[in-house]
């Protein structure tokens, strides 16, 4: 019999859609992928070259479980330059992707019966991780009023994802301020930080430079197109980092060595130029998707970050997504996979080429007008 903890895990809706899309492709159909949250760009050349160089130099062994010092120093410098925050390398641990960092963060602070506040809708792994660890996810709107209602004596943490998946929104300052005043721990998932096209996106560091309550999760997958390299990091206080270090030592030893060395080049000027070019292209695609979505008559917020648009289509999103995929071979993610409030929504990922996105949107237009 399987573990009871695993029974609380729900399937990942986007992967179910992807599996069907790939089956259709194996049958010769041309599927337009607007479901996957993965940059279509290749990893910038300086990063790839450094990865190859590290292999040739024999850097294929374990590293310090905290991660190589050079990379932690680079991350420390990044937060000092961007936020004037004095984050020392010892308050940083490198992980095998930001999802692992998130799991470590939750594992280090929550016990059976604790409650963790999460946004509805939000990244599906949040609720699965929380339940797996014996705690309870509490879904709420990210307004002060909703958070006040959700608080209880069992509240241990809140997960703030900004820019958010699937909404593409950034979280308001008042939400951070409320969280720091009322909640023991703030887990700040900032994996899309940097992918912002207008306005201001806060970092938790701006509200808690001493890291008394903050567990900041970030990585290289989204901004640097390094999804397959599996490299992320956690920033927090000494107590939390030491707890995560124990988990890392026992479960994973260290993050992938070649990925750590390759990531050193993420901070180079040449890489920065490539990233800026990617961001401009993402913004161009965002504007294209928003134009079509509004022409379809769908209600939509103003997504200013990440690479998702999350419209209300006025009907069951799951039924719509599967029917669209089978009839027009366009893959979208049903909104219900992100929370109960996503039932009549779909998520459109614009992490695909401009041409493919336009073709996919034209197919949706045909589907709606049939």
Swiss-Prot record:
One GO cellular component term: cytoplasm
Enzyme Commission number(s): 2.6.1.108
Cofactor: pyridoxal 5'-phosphate
Pathway: Cofactor biosynthesis; methanofuran biosynthesis
Any GO molecular function: pyridoxal phosphate binding
Family, similarity comment: Belongs to the class-I pyridoxal-phosphate-dependent aminotransferase family.
Assembly and oligomerization: Homodimer.
Protein name, as recorded: (5-formylfuran-3-yl)methyl phosphate transaminase
Name of the gene this protein is made from: mfnC
């Amino acid at each position: 019999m399987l573990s009871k903890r695993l029974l609380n895990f729900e399937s990942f809706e986007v992967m179910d859609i992807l599996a069907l899309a790939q089956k259709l492709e194996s049958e010769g159909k041309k599927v337009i992928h607007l479901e996957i949250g993965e940059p279509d760009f290749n990893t910038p050349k300086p990063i790839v070259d450094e990865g190859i160089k590290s292999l040739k130099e024999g850097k294929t062994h374990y590293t310090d479980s905290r991660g190589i010092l050079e990379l932690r120093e680079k991350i420390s410098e990044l937060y000092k330059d961007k936020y004037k925050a004095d984050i020392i390398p010892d308050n940083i641990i490198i992980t095998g992707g930001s999802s692992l960092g998130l799991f470590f963060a939750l594992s280090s602070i929550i016990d059976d019966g604790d409650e963790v506040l999460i946004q509805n809708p939000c990244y599906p792994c949040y609720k699965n991780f929380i339940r797996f660890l014996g705690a309870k996810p509490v879904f709420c709107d990210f307004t002060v009023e909703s958070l006040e209602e959700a608080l209880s004596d069992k509240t241990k943490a809140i997960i703030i994802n900004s820019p958010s998946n699937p909404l593409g929104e950034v979280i308001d300052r008042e939400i951070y301020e409320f969280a720091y005043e009322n909640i023991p721990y703030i887990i700040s998932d900032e994996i899309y930080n940097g992918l912002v096209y207008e306005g201001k996106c806060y970092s938790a560091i701006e509200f808690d430079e001493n890291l008394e309550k903050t567990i900041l999760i970030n990585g290289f997958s989204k901004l640097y197109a390094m999804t397959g390299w599996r490299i992320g990091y956690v920033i927090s206080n000494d107590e939390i980092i030491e707890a995560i270090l124990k988990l890392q030592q026992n479960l994973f030893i260290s993050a992938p060595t070649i990925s750590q060395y390759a990531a050193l080049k993420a901070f180079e000027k040449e890489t920065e130029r490539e990233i800026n070019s990617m961001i401009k292209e993402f913004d161009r695609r965002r504007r294209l998707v928003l134009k079509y979505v509004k022409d379809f008559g769908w209600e939509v917020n103003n997504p200013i970050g990440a690479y998702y648009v999350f419209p209300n289509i006025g009907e069951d999103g799951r039924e719509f997504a599967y029917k669209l995929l089978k009839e027009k071979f366009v893959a979208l993610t049903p909104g219900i996979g992100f929370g109960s409030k996503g039932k009549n929504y779909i998520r459109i990922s614009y992490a695909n080429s401009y041409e493919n996105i336009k073709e996919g949107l034209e197919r949706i237009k045909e589907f709606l007008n049939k």
